[in-house]
Amino acid sequence: MTLGYIGSYTKKSGKGIYRFKLNDETGVIEALETGYEIEASTYLTRNESFLYAITKEGEECGVASFSIKEDGQLELINKCLESKQGTGCYIQVSSNGKYLFEAVYGAGLARIYKLNQITGAIEKLIEELAHEFPTGSHERQDSSHVHFLNETPDHKYVVATDLGTDRVVTYKFGEDGLKQYAVSQFKNSDGPRHIAFSNDGRHAYIVHELSNEVSVTEYQDGKFIELERHSTIPSDFNGESKLAAVRLSHDGKHLYISNRGHDSIAIFEVLEDGRSLRSIEIQPSYDAFPRDFNITESDNYLICAHQEGESKVSIFERDNITGKLSLKDKKAIANEGVCVLL
C-alpha cells in the first residue's frame, strides 16, 4: 500500500487534508477520508515523520506541523501564524530539516521559518521578504507573485519563481533569513511557476504558467541558463489554459506537466543527460483543473488531483519504458484537491 495525502482549498466543500491508501497491485484507491480538518491547506510537505501544511485562521496566516502516526493519522504539533500578508501556495523543508520555506503568491513574499528538528515544531518565522522587481505585461502580472520556494540540489541556495516578474531568484539562507544571490530573467509574460531538477542536479525544468511552456535550463551555482523550450498544450488548442505542476519520474527518464483548462498531462522524454526534451503525448486528466499530481516511489503510478469539476482523483498506470499513462481508477473524490503528497 502507498499512503498519501491531498491538500485542498476550503472555500467550497474542501475539508483540508485528505488521507488515502493506494493498492500498489491494482492501482485503485481503497480508502480516502478526511485526515485533518484545517483551513486553506493548499500545499503540503513532509520531513520524515512530520507533515507540514499551509493554513490560516481569519487574517492570521502561516503553517501548521503534524506528527504522522504509524497508521497515517495526523496529530497536530503546533501552528505558526505570524503574518497577516496572505496565505502561501507552496512549502518545502530544507534538506537539513532546520528550515521551512513558504511562497506567498498574492503578496509576492518569500518566508523562511525555523524548525525544531527533534519535535517537528515550527519555532518562529525568521523572515518575510517581499519581491520588488519590474513586472511583466500580462494582465495577471500586476505585481510580484512568488509561486515556488525550494532548496537547490547542491544544498547551497533556495530558489523562488516569480510569476509576476518573469524571474527566478536565488537566495542564500540561514539563521539570519534570506540574502539575494542571483536573478535569472525569462521572457516577458512567461510567468514562471514551478521547477523540477534533474536527478544529477545539473539541469532544471522551469514551467511557465502564462506561456504554457517549459524551459530546459542548465543549473550552475544558483544560476539558470535556458537551453530550449517546449509547449505543453497542442498548437491547435484555442481555449484558455494555464500550466500547473511539474514532476520528474524517479528514474529521471520522463517529465510530466499538468495543464488546467486543457485538462491534461503533457509527457516528455528526457534526452542528452537532461539537456533536452522530446514530446511523447498529451494525456487527458479526466476531470477539471488538474492542479497537482505525484508519482509513486515505484514509478508505477501517477496520482492526479483536480481542483474543479467533480474533484476526482485520477490514478494512471505508468509505462516505465515509454513513460505513457493509462487510466486505472477515477472513483475517489477529494473536494478542491490541489496538492498530492506521497
From Swiss-Prot:
InterPro entries: Cycloisomerase_2 (IPR050282), Haem_d1_sf (IPR011048), Lactonase_7-beta_prop (IPR019405), WD40/YVTN_repeat-like_dom_sf (IPR015943). GO terms for molecular function: 6-phosphogluconolactonase activity. Pfam families: Lactonase. It comes from the Bacteria. One of its GO terms (cellular component) is cytosol. Belongs to the cycloisomerase 2 family. This is Uncharacterized protein SERP1457. It comes from Staphylococcus epidermidis (strain ATCC 35984 / DSM 28319 / BCRC 17069 / CCUG 31568 / BM 3577 / RP62A).
